[in-house]
């Protein structure tokens, strides 16, 4: 409906456009730009979004990014939404707000994977087709009984990368945070699924890739399982403030190792 209205409004000779309401473009709430300062938009799930009152509460790296980035040089906008996958972040309009807010020179960090693994058409219905192939399929949603086209993890990532570049921004693909699960003294890694798929899309598109998953996992391996518990919040996925700050600092470390201009900020 929105696209139809936009089409009508763009036709100068079409009388019907006078009956349209003013078109509203959704943007990121609370964004205040300062001259000469690029904006970093953080997109993702709860591991990026969360903020809490207590140190050992649930925290996301986007909420504490100020510990790793100089806010006198960049503006930080945490646009992540808890519980979202690439698919639901797009379908619910969260991505549109970011897209409409991007200006040339801005950075968009794209970090998903934890919720993309979920069911596609049952329960929370937020999962995607596994892999990076340019694949789609029509599924019947159990809750609504409506049909919906669902794409692959790689398709959604490539769309995000393309959209950011279309606006003159710089996309940065960030692999998902590691979970606090251990085997034989080493933390669990997802280098065979969502971690490697993020890397593959970066290689396909030429986008900057920060392997946060392994950067943080390497650090926690050195800390050991007992000490690593302090970086998480009572479950295997969500981090405490200490853990969120670690992820933010590892992200900054990855940017520096990649010689990203943003690392100077």
Go through each PLM region and give its residues.
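Gly/Ser/Thr-rich beta-alpha loop segments that engage phosphate groups in nucleotides
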Residues: 46, 85, 115
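N-terminal charge/polar-biased segments
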Residues: 16, 31, 259-265
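Serine-esterase "nucleophile elbow" of acetyl-processing enzymes
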Residues: 3-81, 96-108, 124-132
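Short, solvent-exposed loop/turn segments at secondary-structure boundaries
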Residues: 52-56, 88-90, 184-189
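Alpha-helical cap/lid subdomain in secreted, periplasmic
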Residues: 97-241, 245, 249-263
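Ordered, small/hydrophobic-rich secondary-structure cores
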Residues: 1-2, 209
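N-terminal post-signal-peptidase region of extra-cytosolic proteins
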Residues: 86-97
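Acidic, glycine-rich active-site loops and adjacent beta-strand->loop/helix elements
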Residues: 81-84, 178
């Amino acid at each position: 409906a929105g696209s139809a209205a936009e089409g009508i409004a763009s036709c100068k000779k079409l009388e019907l456009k006078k009956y349209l309401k003013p078109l509203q473009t959704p943007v990121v709430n609370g964004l205040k730009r300062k001259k000469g300062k690029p904006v970093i938009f953080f997109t993702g799930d709860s591991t990026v979004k969360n903020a809490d009152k207590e140190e050992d509460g649930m925290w996301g790296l986007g909420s504490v990014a100020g510990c790793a980035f100089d806010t006198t040089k960049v503006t930080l906008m945490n646009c992540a939404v808890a519980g979202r996958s690439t698919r639901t972040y797009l379908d619910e309009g969260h991505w549109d707000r970011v897209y409409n807010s991007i200006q040339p020179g801005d950075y968009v960090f794209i970090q998903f994977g934890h919720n993309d693994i979920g069911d596609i058409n049952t329960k929370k219905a937020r999962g995607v087709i596994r892999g990076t192939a340019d694949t789609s399929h029509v599924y019947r949603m159990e809750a609504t009984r409506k049909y919906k086209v669902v794409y692959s993890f790689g398709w959604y990532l490539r769309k995000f990368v393309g959209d950011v570049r279309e606006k003159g921004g710089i996309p940065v693909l960030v692999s998902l945070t590691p979970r606090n699960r251990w085997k034989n003294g080493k933390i669990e890694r997802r280098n065979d699924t969502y971690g490697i798929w993020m890397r593959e899309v970066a290689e396909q598109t030429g986008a900057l890739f920060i392997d946060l998953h392994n950067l943080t996992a390497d650090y926690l391996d050195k800390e050991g399982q007992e000490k690593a518990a302090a970086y998480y919040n009572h479950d295997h996925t969500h981090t405490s403030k200490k853990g969120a700050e670690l992820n933010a600092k590892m992200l900054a470390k990855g940017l520096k190792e990649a010689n990203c201009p943003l690392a100077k900020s």
